[in-house]
Amino acid sequence: MIEFVYPHTQLVAGVDEVGRGPLVGAVVTAAVILDPARPIVGLNDSKKLSEKRRLALYDEIKEKALSWSLGRAEPHEIDELNILHATMLAMQRAVAGLHIAPEYVLIDGNRCPALPVPSMAVVKGDSRVAEISAASIIAKVTRDAEMAALDGIFPQYGFAQHKGYPTAFHLAALAEHGATEHHRRSFAPVKRALGLAS
């Protein structure tokens, strides 16, 4: 793994996304600028934390961060642009939503969207960079809550459990009930359920 060197600037934003793989709902991104004077203990990749710990850190990040923002790309944008370009758009929206302009942006993964400030992609950044860990927590808690709300409207799909990922249960529900307006119609399992697969 390439050695990561933290940038020598004051205002560093971390950016991460949640929801590239699911068949339903938005891809949700977050951008976070942490306050060095108010450290947050226990930041890590959101997927490695218990739900209880994630929720506690979510509240602490929102309280202590200098700035945080959400960005999203909706299913119709994912279908129009493709998931990669929609994710980049959502990241741009998250950074643009920060009320303090960052001097540098660190992004989880291996590519950066076009941004008006210097940026760097950090592979496994959600485990290596506190700002990206914080962004991953904000994005995951937000998207999980959206999936729980969608589950209340469409209980037959099990969204609260699988968060929209293509589990056997979700695929069976798609086959039985068809797709909702929240499904990503460009994704192969949804296409098949709609009879659009070639």
Swiss-Prot record:
Q: Which UniProt keywords apply?
A: Cytoplasm, Endonuclease, Hydrolase, Manganese, Metal-binding, Nuclease
Obligatory cofactor(s): Mn(2+); Mg(2+)
Source superkingdom: Bacteria
The EC number on file is 3.1.26.4
Q: Which residues form a coiled coil?
A: none
Which residues make up the binding site for a divalent metal cation?
16-17, 108
Any one GO MF annotation of this record:
manganese ion binding
Output the Pfam families linked to this UniProt entry: RNase_HII
Show where the RNase H type-2 domain sits.
10-198
SUPFAM superfamilies with a match to the protein in the record: Ribonuclease H-like
What this protein catalyses is: Endonucleolytic cleavage to 5'-phosphomonoester
What are the boundaries of the signal sequence?
none
Location comes to:
Cytoplasm
Tell me how the cofactor is bound: Manganese or magnesium. Binds 1 divalent metal ion per monomer in the absence of substrate. May bind a second metal ion after substrate binding.
Q: What is its main location?
A: cytoplasm
Keyword Hydrolase carried by entry: yes
Q: Which InterPro entries match?
A: RNase_HII, RNase_HII/HIII, RNase_HII/HIII_dom, RNaseH-like_sf, RNaseH_sf
Task: Please list the GO biological process terms of this entry.
Answer: DNA replication, removal of RNA primer; mismatch repair
Identify the GO cellular component terms for this protein. Answer: cytoplasm; ribonuclease H2 complex
Q: What does this protein do?
A: Endonuclease that specifically degrades the RNA of RNA-DNA hybrids.
Q: Which PANTHER family match?
A: RIBONUCLEASE H2 SUBUNIT A, RIBONUCLEASE HII
User: Per the similarity annotation, which family is this?
Assistant: Belongs to the RNase HII family.
**Name recorded for this polypeptide:** Ribonuclease HII
Species of origin reads Citrobacter koseri (strain ATCC BAA-895 / CDC 4225-83 / SGSC4696)
Question: Which gene is this protein's source?
Answer: rnhB
